[in-house]
Amino acid sequence: MNSSDINKTDINMSVKIAGVEWKNPVTVASGTFGSGAEYSEFVDLNKLGAVTTKGVADKPWEGNPTPRVAEVYGGMLNAVGLQNPGIELFCKRDIPFLKKYDTKIVVNVCGHSAEEYINVVKRLADEPIDMMEINISCPNVKEGGIAFGTDPVSYTHLTLPTILLV
């Protein structure tokens, strides 16, 4: 058998991640793709296994002051600072946009405190999304982000109540 004998539709690329069936294992990295609308004219979102959104917080964040992005030899550096519209606008605008596509929705949840993360998780509980990703690794915010990821006590205070909510 050679590659011309294989019909693309005959290949099952589906995967199960945390109990959620995806049609394929391809998603975008959180923070690089907005909430999908920004790239929908260039990328067929229907072909992705999931869209992982940019971080979403309890309230809107302006992010870090400019400049936020710098080109360096072989790549780019960024310190956007989790700019986002806040959970209410995200639920009103971005989730309905993403629901138009045949792809899973993974919402990246961020915050400055455990309470903010929990507020976002509670707000998302009744929304038609497939998964949540808890962002405890963003290095360019003063509170939250990597501060949670590098402190096991903070991490436990954040993740345990969040897991119990879901």
Stretches found by the model and what they are:
Residues Y39, N119-R123:
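Catalytic cores of alpha/beta
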Residues T52-K59, D130-C138:
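Non-cysteine beta-strand/loop elements that form the S-adenosyl-L-methionine
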Residues I146-S154:
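Alpha-helix N-cap and loop-to-helix initiation/capping positions
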